[in-house]
Amino acid sequence: MRVFALLFLAFLASGASAIDISNRYRSPRNAERRVRKSTELIVLHTTEAPARSSLNKLCERGEAHYCVTEVGTVYRIIDRDRVAFHAGRSMWNGKEDVDEFSVGIECVGYHDKAMDMVQIRAIRDLVKELQKMYKIPDERVVCHSHVAYGAPNKWQKKNHRGRKRCGMLFAMPSVRTQLGLTRRPASDADVRAKRLVVGDDYLRRVLYGSVDTMKSSYPKTPSPTQGQEGGGLLSWLRGNAKKPDNKNPDAGKPQISAKNPPPPPPKLVPAP
């Protein structure tokens, strides 16, 4: 028993993981990545693509430390103490290049779609282990949207928060509760200090407001501001559809007339 206890203590001291982590997609980029000097954040991402293509890309480019699939499998990409290129143009509390002081976790899925509990549990267990290892409080477990920012462009004249909605669902109170996180960032220090401006008002409400569902106010029509409620053709179809009539199969279709023409198709504008 004493030998077992000593071995267990040695295991903890070594920083070895208690989670089953696969090295199948461990990146060949590890050898060229420098050791990270500090770890202040855990950044959660969504891949916005299926598992296999995401894992292949992450492995090839070394763009995350871990990837968690829909079935809860955890893959190591870049060793946790090395720099992974996951955050891109980023800022947190005045410090740029978040890659230099964070661990990045890619989660197979999409920023506006709920994840199954088997995946949520795997993310939760990994996050909790990393929190203990690096002494990271709940409010510094953030999503990519919290730290990414955009450079000035034709739609935004200043550096702005809103370049990415990646990982946005991990800011929602209900999802954070599932992850065992009791606190979240209270406000955007970089916007408050006027280092950045708000480029996506809907995203701001998700990250720091009370929005807790994608369905309640997610924009339906792309726009330069991205925070504006959309209506467009979908709303017109819903508003003009009548109840189905079994005797007349066309009765449920929206009624088009000179007085009630359908709206023109929305002009798609690239997001800032």
What positions do the PLM features span?
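Sec-dependent signal peptide recognition
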Residues: 1-7
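Hydrophobic h-region of N-terminal signal peptides that target proteins for export
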Residues: 8-17
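Active-site-adjacent loop/helix surface patches within enzyme catalytic domains
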Residues: 18-137
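Basic/polar, cationic surfaces and motifs that engage anionic cell-wall
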Residues: 19-22, 110-272
